[in-house]
Amino acid sequence: MQWPTLWAFSGLLCLCPSQALGQERGACPDVKVVGLGAQDKVVVIQSCPGFPGPPGPKGEPGSPAGRGERGFQGSPGKMGPAGSKGEPGTMGPPGVKGEKGDTGAAPSLGEKELGDTLCQRGPRSCKDLLTRGIFLTGWYTIHLPDCRPLTVLCDMDVDGGGWTVFQRRVDGSIDFFRDWDSYKRGFGNLGTEFWLGNDYLHLLTANGNQELRVDLQDFQGKGSYAKYSSFQVSEEQEKYKLTLGQFLEGTAGDSLTKHNNMSFTTHDQDNDANSMNCAALFHGAWWYHNCHQSNLNGRYLSGSHESYADGINWGTGQGHHYSYKVAEMKIRAS
């Protein structure tokens, strides 16, 4: 190879655009001389890169690669919406019978059942309460034969206790000059004076024998009493007629036997044996005859009084001109 030829070729190579592929202006290609032997030498000129040629045709797809190793488990995704309810499955076989449980508590009673139980097992009188160990005088609930509850004053101190008080006068705070309906239903104040009611008196005395005790106290504090073997009051259709037993004893004497078998009289219903209304005449309400030997529902007067027989009088005690400070009528089953 001749040198002039090489340099001429070299000049042609230097004619390549200086801007090709981002070459800076004035940049020269590198020239390297490679010795091949003693006589020949080859000059290698690294010229600027040419413009890229058009893309070649798409090659054939390669053979599939082998399955790679399993990657790490990803985090769980969000819960999807609930699906529709499926059809119930078939009933499974019965399970093994369990062990017997403990005995349960007794069932609670309803209002009616509780009321019936209290009626059947509850006290029927103050005497009944006494036999159950109640020894204090006071107000208690007993049950009538028709199972209705009734609050009564029980005297647990006098004459062995067990007395049901149905009439009480102590201070004049209650007016006892009342009509038929008032005496039928009862009236007064639990803490002071009262009449229990003729309907209740009938129910309390209709079955079994009831003895009667009358306790009196004058304004000097002296007490006296009268006691009868039995006491019974009929129903309203018979005008609450009094049926009285034998006078047994008492320092006050017997001022009630005269009124035996008499009907009850008030100022608006006259059932006595007098041509006039004894209740209106003597300002009370009682089993008047013609008219009375006792009038414990009369006016509350302060001891001796000039008026005749219109106070809380007990004839065989201090007469018809003396009104007692305290009067109590009470019954007890015998």
Swiss-Prot record:
MF terms (GO), sorted A to Z: carbohydrate binding; carbohydrate derivative binding; metal ion binding; pattern recognition receptor activity
Positions of the Collagen-like domain: 50-88
This protein's record includes keyword NADP: no
Signal peptide range in chain numbering: 1-17
Tissue: Highly expressed in liver and spleen.
InterPro entries assigned to the protein according to its UniProt record, in alphabetical order: Collagen, Fibrinogen-like_C, Fibrinogen_a/b/g_C_1, Fibrinogen_a/b/g_C_dom, Fibrinogen_C-term_domain, Fibrinogen_CS
Stretch list, region A domain: 123-162
Glycosylation, residue list: 261
Sites where the protein binds a carbohydrate: 290-292
Chain spans, region Disordered: 47-117
Domain Fibrinogen C-terminal: 117-334
Region (P domain): 325-334
Keywords: Calcium, Cell membrane, Collagen, Disulfide bond, Glycoprotein, Immunity, Innate immunity, Lectin, Membrane, Metal-binding, Repeat, Secreted, Signal
Disulfide bond residue pairs: 119-147, 126-154, 278-291
Residues that hold Ca(2+) according to the record: 270, 272
UniProt keyword annotation of Disulfide bond present: yes
Site (Mediates specificity for sialic acids): 308
Subcellular location: Secreted; Cell membrane
GO BP, one annotated term: positive regulation of interleukin-8 production
Function recorded in the entry: Extracellular lectin functioning as a pattern-recognition receptor in innate immunity. Binds the sugar moieties of pathogen-associated molecular patterns (PAMPs) displayed on microbes and activates the lectin pathway of the complement system. May also activate monocytes through a G protein-coupled receptor, FFAR2, inducing the secretion of interleukin-8/IL-8. Binds preferentially to 9-O-acetylated 2-6-linked sialic acid derivatives and to various glycans containing sialic acid engaged in a 2-3 linkage.
Record family assignment: Belongs to the ficolin lectin family.
Notes concerning its domains: The fibrinogen C-terminal domain mediates calcium-dependent binding to carbohydrates and tethering to the cell surface in monocytes and granulocytes. The domain undergoes a conformational switch at pH under 6.2, and looses its carbohydrate-binding ability.
Quaternary data: Homotrimer. Interacts with elastin/ELN. Interacts (via Fibrinogen C-terminal domain) with FFAR2. Interacts with CRP; may regulate monocyte activation by FCN1.
Protein name: Ficolin-1
Organism of origin: Mus musculus (Mouse)
Upper taxonomic lineage: Eukaryota, Metazoa, Chordata, Craniata, Vertebrata
